[in-house]
Structures are given as C-alpha cells and as structure tokens.
Amino acid sequence: MLWMKSWFETRWRFLFVLGFAAFQLINVVHHNVPDQPFAVAKLVYPMSFFITIIGIMLGGAGINTQVAFRAIKGLHGSMYFTLALPVSRYRLLATRAATGVLELTAVIMLLCAGLWTTVPQLRALMTLPEMLVYGFALSVSAASFYSVSVLLATFLDGQWQIWGSMIFVLGMQEVSERLPVPHPLDLFRPLTTDSPLATHVLPWSGMGISVVLAAILFCLSMKIVQLREY
C-alpha cells in the first residue's frame, strides 16, 4: 500500500524525467556522426548534468504529503489517508525515498541502454553489461544529490525545494572547482573525469563517499520528519 501510494505521488515527475531522458537520447543521436570517432567527453559532462537534475527532481516529489506535514493543493485526501495509516514516519519516509531511488535507477539504466543501442561507436567501445555498470555507477554517485533534495523537501515545498537543491549543488560544484578538494571527496569526479565511460574502472572511492553522505543526509531528514508537527 505504501509503495503504491509513493508511486501515485511521484509518477508525474517520473514520467516528466523519463521524457527528459528521451529528449537527451534523441539529442545525442541527432548530433552523432557514425563515421567519426566518438568523443566520450561530449557525453560524460551532459550526462553528469542530466543525472544531477533528475536526482533533484525525483528526490523531492511527494515528501510532504507522504509524511503528512501539510495538505498541499490537490492532495488533501492523500494527507488524511496518510494520517490514518498505522505506520511510523520513518517507514513513510524510507518508502518514499526508496521509491525515488528505484525510479532514478530505472531512468538512468534505460537511458544507458538506449545510448548503447543507438550509438554505434559506444557498441564498439563497450558491451551492454559494461554500459549498464556505467549506469549503476551513475546511480550510486547521484545518491548524494538525491539525498540533498530529500532533505530540503522535508521543510520546503515544490519549486522552493527544487531551486534550493540546484543552488546547493551548484555551490558545491563551484567550491570543488575553486578549492583544492581531495580527489576522493570530490562528488563530481565519479560523474565526469572518473566516470567508467572514460576510465573503464568503477570509481569506488567516489561512490563510497556518495553513499556515506547520502546516509547522513537521510538521517538528518528523518530527524526533521520526527520533529515536525502537523
């Protein structure tokens, strides 16, 4: 029941992100010249931007109604239904966050499979399983940005949550470019220069840092959820 409720409250953002992924795929295919060598860098950086955006969008969908903070316009029945459920806020938030992670992973995997299928040069560079491993690395590396969006969604609504997440992530990127951030602590490297698409090696340190940071941010989100009144 909770999983179905999470899906109903996130499905429109998921479908929008899926359409965004289709546009990204069409754009890559349109600008690709099959007879020329494939420039990996031209794909890695747009992909990192795309992954960050969809992580932010999927992270905040349905958080407030899922944990019954307030009745948002058009979702009043959802809030009252949530209040009637004999479940804890921790379970509500965990289910909602897990739903978003699954949606994020699904979009990334579909995009990677689509790129491998439609770009001949990629098929020459790697196999489909290797491309899906690249998608897995992207999903794990995006977990920290996703968790930032979840955290902000616990006390911000709609567009404020999206803009707040974008400003925070852009600020992190600016700091990583201007300050000597240690290589393993740079959250953007696994999506760009250390991407398996370029190195053919999984960025284990970057992925590990992303998972640890995501866990910390989720714990903070849970604390906020437990302290909020409705």
Describe each region flagged by the PLM.
Residues N27-V44, A153-F155, I162-Y230:
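Terminal transmembrane helical anchor/hairpin motif
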Residues M1-A21:
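Aromatic- and glycine-rich beta-strand/loop motifs that create alpha-glucan
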Residues Y45-F69:
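Long, hydrophobic alpha-helical segments
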Residues T52-A61, A143-S147, G206-S221:
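Hydrophobic cores of alpha-helical transmembrane segments in multi-pass inner/ER membrane proteins
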Residues L25-V29, V40-M47, A94-I162, S205, ...:
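Secretory targeting signals
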Residues G60-F81, A97:
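Transmembrane helix boundary and interhelical loop/hinge segments in multi-pass membrane proteins
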Residues F81-R89:
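Short helix-to-coil transition segments within interhelical loops
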